[in-house]
Design a protein with these regions (language model features):
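PLP-dependent amino-acid enzyme catalytic core
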Residues: 1-231
Length: 231
């Protein structure tokens, strides 16, 4: 397993926000910034890179990125002694994250195009080169790693949240959360290998109700929220 000790981030109660809103309910935030490269992407990257290592033909990972994915991919590739290639849109990347990717030894390729153009390029490369693994969220193992947030929230609260709000880009992370909650609630859960599903903990999981998940997007880039195309 290729790990940088990701996960187990704190769930922090926002007492001041509750007071400001006059809320008669509890508000919590999951501090994913405490992951190794500063984002939830590390949860998925440990899975994606670990699975890539299982294929002896793969010696490189590749991603298109405007920020967090580039830093995470570069860090985990370095840990696994794999080469990392990052495709970035022209002038459209968070420089702090780009600096991380460079520091971890990734090869950076800037294109005259947007993120979607970059995604098309990396998919074509991976289709043509059997030694290259795509580690963007279209990689299903990324989603499997990121769903662990839901499990942690359930453990830390001791129950399901009633509502879960989170930002949405291409919807990979909100999908991962939903998969996690569905597994916890028993909608797609098989059984515990240790107790065959008979312990008190497993019983509480199987009867947990699904939360309402609400995604939100920045006003300048909200294609899912508005149904409009943004360049």
């Amino acid at each position: 397993i290729v790990s940088l000790h990701e996960g187990n981030t704190p769930l922090i109660r926002f007492y001041n926000l509750e007071k400001y809103l006059g809320a008669n309910f509890s508000i919590y935030g999951k501090f994913e910034g405490l992951n190794p490269t500063g984002s939830f992407k590390d949860r998925g990257m440990t899975m994606a890179v670990s699975k890539a290592l299982e294929n002896k033909n793969i010696d490189s990972v590749i991603c298109a990125s405007t920020g967090n994915t580039s830093a995470s991919a570069a860090a985990y590739a370095a840990r696994a002694n794999l080469k990392c290639f990052v495709i970035i849109p022209d002038g459209q990347i968070a420089f702090g994250k780009l600096a991380q990717a460079i520091a971890y030894g990734a090869k950076i390729i800037q294109i005259n195009g947007n993120f979607d153009d970059g995604m098309s390029i990396i998919k074509n490369i991976a289709d043509e080169q059997s030694n290259v693994c795509v580690v963007n969220s279209l990689n299903p193992f990324r989603i499997q790693g990121q769903k662990t947030i839901s499990y942690e929230i359930f453990d830390q609260l001791g129950k399901m949240p009633d509502y879960h709000f989170l930002p949405v880009g291409n919807a990979g992370n909100i999908n991962a959360h939903w998969i996690g909650y569905k597994e916890i609630s028993g909608h797609s859960f098989n059984h515990c290998n240790l107790c065959s599903g008979n312990c008190e903990y497993m019983s509480s999981i199987k009867h947990a109700e699904l939360p309402v998940i609400i995604g939100y997007q920045a006003i300048g880039a909200a294609p899912l929220a508005t149904g409009k195309t943004f360049n």
